[in-house]
């Protein structure tokens, strides 16, 4: 089967918005190629293996979308271009925006992204292992089996990496964890393997919910429940930890609601915040939470806070 590959060159800031537009237009798959992520991992002591072919020049990211050939494909591509340009009106920098279109075979793209995803060690003992890769654990390493599919969350993105580092320090044996906007389920699965008693993971996107469920099953976990929810809407009870790796606007919305779902002195781990909006997010969080620590990496920051 033939597919249309649409390659969009843009900025890291626009990455998530561009990806969302592609999914909304019916892309059969989306691949993000970010050479800056590879460089950051290479400079860190906390990585296991990166193939030499991944080291490319720094620069803008490339987002690839794959659409089945149909009568309306050209219209979809034009809409995609218009909507990406429109992002500028929302204050999102799209950089030297460029679009390239080509025709490819299904076999060429459906596994293409896997070459950029290798076993990765994060923090002191967390290892994210693609389900198709071989890896022998060493010492007390915790192996997270993952097949992200079309959902966000592989461990290579700065926001996910910082969340994992925080979780390694804050998850306790009796912890109840709420994962809001769970994506691939990577944070929920890690929380469980770090010893959490119960983990509840939700996403508004049905594809993410299904991918997360598959990854929970892949890791043979019984204490992680995955369901569809618009933010905290379908969660019940109270948690010791709420983790949300989303975007700044959603973190701001959550800041007033999260305390109702947290136990006394519960922790709120918020990520997906672009550095330029850190101050704004902090101002919205502080009426409800005491900020304990902030991590920064690349263009992103992650905030750990405690319920007042």
UniProtKB/Swiss-Prot annotation:
A Gene Ontology biological process term: methylation
Residues reported to bind S-adenosyl-L-methionine: 160, 181, 203, 245
Methyltransferase among keywords: yes
Function noted in UniProt: Methylates ribosomal protein L11.
GO cellular component annotations of the record: cytoplasm
Source taxon at top rank: Bacteria
Entry EC no(s): 2.1.1.-
Family of this protein: Belongs to the methyltransferase superfamily. PrmA family.
Enzyme class: transferase
Catalytic activity, reaction form: L-lysyl-[protein] + 3 S-adenosyl-L-methionine = N(6),N(6),N(6)-trimethyl-L-lysyl-[protein] + 3 S-adenosyl-L-homocysteine + 3 H(+)
Full protein name: Ribosomal protein L11 methyltransferase
Record GO terms (molecular function): protein-lysine N-methyltransferase activity
């Amino acid at each position: 089967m033939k597919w249309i590959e649409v390659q969009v060159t843009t900025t890291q800031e626009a990455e998530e918005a561009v990806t969302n537009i592609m999914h909304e237009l019916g892309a059969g798959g989306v691949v993000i190629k970010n050479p800056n992520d590879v460089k950051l991992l290479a400079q860190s002591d906390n990585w296991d293996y990166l193939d030499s072919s991944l080291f490319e020049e720094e620069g803008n990211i490339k987002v690839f979308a794959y659409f089945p050939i149909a009568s309306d494909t050209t219209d979809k591509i034009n809409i995609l271009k218009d909507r990406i340009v429109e992002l500028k009106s929302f204050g999102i920098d799209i950089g030297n925006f460029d679009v390239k279109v080509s025709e490819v075979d299904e076999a060429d793209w459906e596994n293409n992204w896997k070459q950029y995803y290798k076993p990765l060690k994060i923090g002191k003992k967390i290892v994210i292992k693609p389900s198709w890769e071989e890896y022998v654990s060493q010492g007390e390493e915790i192996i997270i089996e993952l097949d992200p599919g079309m959902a966000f969350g592989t461990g290579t993105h700065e926001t996910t990496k910082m969340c994992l580092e925080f979780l390694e320090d804050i998850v306790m044996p009796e912890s109840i964890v709420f994962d809001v906007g769970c994506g691939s389920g990577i944070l929920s699965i890690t929380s469980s393997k770090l010893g959490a008693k119960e983990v509840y993971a939700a996403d508004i996107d049905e594809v993410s919910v299904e991918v997360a469920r598959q990854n929970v099953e892949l890791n043979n976990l019984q204490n992680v429940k995955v369901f569809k929810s618009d933010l905290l809407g379908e969660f019940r009870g109270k948690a010791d930890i709420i983790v949300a790796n989303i975007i700044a606007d959603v973190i701001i919305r959550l800041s007033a609601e999260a305390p109702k779902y947290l136990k006394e002195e519960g922790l709120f781990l918020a990520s997906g915040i672009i550095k330029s909006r850190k101050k704004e997010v902090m101002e919205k969080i502080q009426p409800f939470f005491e900020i304990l620590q902030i991590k920064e990496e690349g263009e992103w920051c992650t905030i750990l806070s405690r319920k007042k």
